[in-house]
Amino acid sequence: MFDVLMYLFETYIHNEAEMRVDQDRLTRDLTDAGFEREDIYNALLWLEKLADYQEGLVEPMQLASDPLSVRIYTAEECERLDASCRGFVLFLEQIQVLNLETREMVIERVMALDTAEFELEDLKWVILMVLFNIPGCENAYQQMEELLFEVNEGMLH
């Protein structure tokens, strides 16, 4: 499922392709690209839930705004998000790429993924997808994109 999300983000969203794509055509395109129908369905459902945030159909969790508060992760969240992932989320909060609401959206979308393995690189892409879809997060998206691509480009040299 995550591979389908990455393919969609890179092909349609990140490359600024036409956003109004018929779901049946999209499913055919993804099937032709070699993805399994179940993974396609799960990825599209995941994106629909993300779009609910964008359209205001789902309110993000209302949290205390005390800057000294610390997020305590559940056991299930700790299984999916290892220490490096949780540290990266905290880092993004500290540099104000994520706020309390977007952090919770990211965690919710990570937990909704149907994947056995999840790494820091995967988290970075989920964060990018969430920020891209949330109105008012354009600057945070740009910062995250710069962080993601500067680090990856630096590794090529």
Swiss-Prot record:
Signal peptide region: none
Pfam families named among the record's database cross-references: DUF494
InterPro entries named among the record's database cross-references: Smg
Sequence similarity: Belongs to the Smg family.
HAMAP family from the UniProt entry: Smg
Name of the protein in its database record: Protein Smg
